[in-house]
Amino acid sequence: MKNSASIMENMPDSGSNIEEAKKTEVFEPRIIGFLCNWCSYAGADKAGAAQKHYSPNVSVIKVMCSGRIDPQFIMDAFQNGADGVMILACHPGDCHYKEGNYRAVQRHRLLLRLLKQFGIEEERCRFDYVSAGEGDRFVSVINETVEAVKKLGPLKIIKN
């Protein structure tokens, strides 16, 4: 019968196993997607109905209008662990509420300046247009965003 000292000598160092696992671990970003109810969310439905495959890294939040997305929602998403955020709006001129998507564009521009102040790359916050009939475009935007955020790596944000 072996004594406990000889058993321990033959066991691999668990600390090195953890470090090896971290090196081989593939980064899968967490992305929050804010989708307009009238266009982008319907585009997502179309993609789903057509059984289009896209990255599961995006958690969708349906909003009635992209113009109602408060910049604080985006900051909260990053503060709570999101590596990226998407805002998907109606195409210009197609907003159900007339001007909501224009308001969203203006807020996004201001938000990018704010993110820069916090050291967050602007590529982590994508704004794009997807209409109700653009299921394929929805899939492309999702997959492009996930790949862009993967290249950036995990968001390193300092919490208070």
Predicted regions span which residues?
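Iron-sulfur-associated redox domains of electron-transfer enzymes in respiratory
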Residues: 1-160
